Amino acid sequence: MKNLGYYNGEIGLIEEMKVPMTDRGLYFGDGIYDAAYSRNHVIYALDEHIARFYRNLSLLDLNLDMTPQQLGELLCDLVRRVDDGEQFVYWQATRGSALRQHVYPEDGHGRANLMVMLRPVKIRDKDAPMKLISAPDMRYLYCDIKTLSLLPSVLSAQKAKEAGVDECVMHRDGRVTECSHSNVSMLKGGVFITPPTDCYILPGVGRAHLLSACRTLGIPCEERPFTMDELRDADEIIVSSAGILCSAVTELDGLPVGGKDAATFGKLQDYLFDDWFEKTRCE
């Protein structure tokens, strides 16, 4: 089985799974999600992704009838059921099912729906540089929550596709926030600089791994706002996410960027890919 689906205890092919029309995720995007990647049927950084998922459940007043340990065991069991060990593992919880009304359903504090989807996807190749465009950040101020309400990110990602590039980096009130579905950081003068984790960006697991790698490798790091002009002038621009461990950017808005500190970037990238391969190797 390749494309595996799960919904409230039911398991089958994604294409054959059924979700009730009254699921509040369909009406309002009233829910949260997370995603990770597996290799050799081992999910990378699973504990970190689950911790973020439960933090977001709490922020949205959602109660999932499952402990973090139980969710982890479920995800690992589902990954072991698929043919290919390299999988994109996606899961979401919504505020239950009820006829459409904005307020919570009467049982909305204890009847969350859980959906899981698995399909064969590899992480981005380390030798594949990225091209970006930029656009104003039109999202609202819940960007630190991995909510299902992703319309602005969908539109930005589509703009990137139509421009023939990989991602769209967004900016708000003069400062860089993040890309449509990944974090963006930079190297300047040997220092790793990444936006702070406030309401404007998602606290990415990949971003956290970059900061940890910097500390291990002795690379100075700063968490602070920076502008698009600073980004264009960076020695290296770095994109990161669950599926993009550490990728260099070579073009921004049609102009060449980066390529000025390959040594420091290479250390970071090698460290992160070594960690990926080590923690997902066959036992």
Predicted regions, residues:
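Ordered, amphipathic secondary-structure segments that act as subunit-interaction surfaces
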Residues: 75, 80-93
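Feature marks short, surface-exposed loop/turn motifs that line or immediately flank catalytic pockets
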Residues: 97
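Helix-start/capping segments and mature chain N-termini
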Residues: 1-77, 94, 104-283
